[in-house]
């Protein structure tokens, strides 16, 4: 299996830490974390090329959907897979996130032991 590089964007330090511990336990994944949409966009503009982005929906200043819209304008990131992470998992919300271009949604709180499998599953479902 190919090693996946994940960019995880979340304003909550505890969520970033749990995700980092979970994903770094998986020998087939490497991780870069960002505390805001703006920080993530800066990293991407400096040639970070993740295989997938885990993107929190609700963040101050620049939320997940706003970050995704700006991400799609960056050369080389028009099709980077994005998985939204949210506590709002009503079907109308999930459908909205998919319509915005996400390949999947992970509901918070998430099971740290299955986070890597959830990422792989969303990528497989999207044919990536």
Show the residue positions of the predicted features.
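Conserved acidic segment of CheY-like receiver
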Residues: 3-14, 19-23, 53
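Acidic, metal-coordinating helix/loop segments flanking the phosphotransfer/catalytic sites
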Residues: 33-52
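Receiver (REC) domain active-site loop signature in two-component systems and cognate sites
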Residues: 59
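Short, glycine/charged-rich "phosphate-handling" switch motifs in NTP-dependent
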Residues: 103
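C-terminal output helix
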Residues: 110-119
């Amino acid at each position: 299996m190919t090693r996946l590089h994940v960019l995880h964007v979340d304003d909550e330090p505890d969520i970033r830490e749990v995700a980092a511990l979970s994903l770094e336990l998986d020998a087939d994944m490497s991780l870069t974390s960002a505390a805001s949409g703006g920080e993530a966009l800066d990293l991407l503009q400096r040639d970070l090329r993740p295989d997938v982005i885990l993107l929190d929906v609700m963040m101050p200043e620049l939320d997940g959907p706003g970050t995704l819209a700006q991400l799609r304008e960056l050369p080389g990131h028009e099709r980077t897979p994005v998985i939204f992470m949210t506590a709002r998992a009503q079907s109308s919300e999930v459908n909205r996130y998919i319509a915005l271009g996400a390949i999947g949604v992970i509901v918070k709180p998430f099971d740290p032991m299955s986070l890597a499998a959830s990422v792989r599953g969303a990528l497989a479902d999207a044919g990536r």
